[in-house]
Amino acid sequence: FKEQGGYEVEGTVRGAEMVGWRYGGPFDDLAAQQEPGGYPPPLVAPGESPGAEWKSSVETHRVIDGGRDSKGNALVVAGEGTGIVHMAPGCGDVDHQVGTQLGLPVIAPLQEDGTFGDGFGPFSGRRAIDPATADLVFEELKKKELLVYVETYPHIYPHCWRTGDELVFRLVDEWFINMDWRDEIK
């Protein structure tokens, strides 16, 4: 980034030394970020799920160790970016798994039609996959003087097996009934 406006190295810190540090997020001013227990509000009472303390997303911003999956593989691996990753438990499978383990509140921003719900300020009502929404995110970050540089970065997304369209992760409450027993009653 030195070419894009300059910087000076003031020191070097190993990632392990950062674990536990608290920080302010770029969109902590949004109502959804300040909702105790997550957004939309959870359907369980405090204490019914591990780590549920009814804290807002803003109150839980901290640097964590990304951990490992069930096979012992690092969840965040070298070669996939900076090595510092924001966990968004309502926006991705791995994020949701790690967030649940750590008791982080879940912010599930998308409605059924793929637009941001109420509580997301200028993003409310906008389609998540619309390039204009990404541009608005960049504009908001610039206003807050939090944007250093923008570049296109390849990112692996799930795709529909039939159409090839990119899919967005949307957290929903669902339940299923196991119907395997029906053959036994005939």
How does the language model describe each region?
Residues 1-53, 113-123, 161-186:
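Conserved, charged catalytic cores of large soluble enzymes
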Residues 2-7, 58-59, 103-105, 143-145:
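Structural alpha-beta junctions
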Residues 20, 67-186:
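Residue patterns forming the tRNA-binding/recognition surfaces of aminoacyl-tRNA synthetases
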Residues 31-93:
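Catalytic-site beta-strand/loop segments enriched in glycine and acidic/polar residues
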